[in-house]
Amino acid sequence: MLSSRSKQVRRDAIALSKANGGYHYGGSFSCAEILINLWDHKLTESDRFILSKGHGCWVYYVILRELGFNPTLEGHPHYEPEEGIFCTAGSMGHGLPVGIGMALARKLNNQEGKVFVLMGDGECQEGTTWESLLIAGQLKLPNLVAIVDNNGIQGSGFVKDILPVIPALMSAAESAGWRVVEIDGHNSDLLDLDLDSSSRPTLVIAQTIKGKGVSFMENVPKWHSNWLAGDLETQALEELK
């Protein structure tokens, strides 16, 4: 059962994307609660957030606009620090390396705050993700939190049929010195995580459902990037009341 807050954010994301030519609903809805929990409860002014899975931007834009930012409404976010966006996204596997650089700079300069990076499970197939796991573990960055939206679907189909990667990623991260935890990405598990006492970077595997909240989108690959209109749009908005 989604909260009224979660439903409204999804409705607003549909309206915003429709008005600006957007169509990545599945990945936006799978990470909605992660974004809501982070921005409503976890992030402080000292923290930085990177949406590495840029196609999940429509819920992100909704939340940024609620906070008074005015980001450019494109299909993937681009660097606009004055509007709350600290990394261009779209090409997969780039957010974590950038986040490591930010976290290392903060560590070296004794700056407060953490760096949160939200990634997709499909982009965890990228070599840059694996290289980043190794270097972050070696650098011992306790101020780095990487969250994987593990919805099981990428642009061309189910992850399990293309290159199942998450179990190996978790094992590699632990071997490289990360703290690894699994949560339900659609409830408040993220809020219960103690992120202050770890001396290592933290990898959070958030189990989610692609298209969460709209019955005909849930766990259906075509809704990674499908246009919403007509009766289906009406049904989606009705289900999110």
Name what the model sees in each region.
Residues 4-22, 149-152:
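N-terminal capping segment at the start of a domain
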Residues 126-151, 201-207:
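A short alpha/beta connector and helix-capping loop motif
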Residues 86, 139-165, 169:
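A short, conserved beta-to-alpha structural element at the edge of catalytic cores
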Residues 54-57, 119-126, 150-154, 186-188, ...:
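Acidic, glycine-rich active-site loops and adjacent beta-strand->loop/helix elements
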Residues 172, 186-241:
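Glycine/aspartate-rich loop-and-adjacent alpha/beta segment that forms the canonical ThDP
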Residues 47-49, 113-117, 144, 198-208:
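Generic beta-sheet signal
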Residues 14-138:
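Cofactor-binding active-site loop characterized by glycine-rich and histidine/acidic residues
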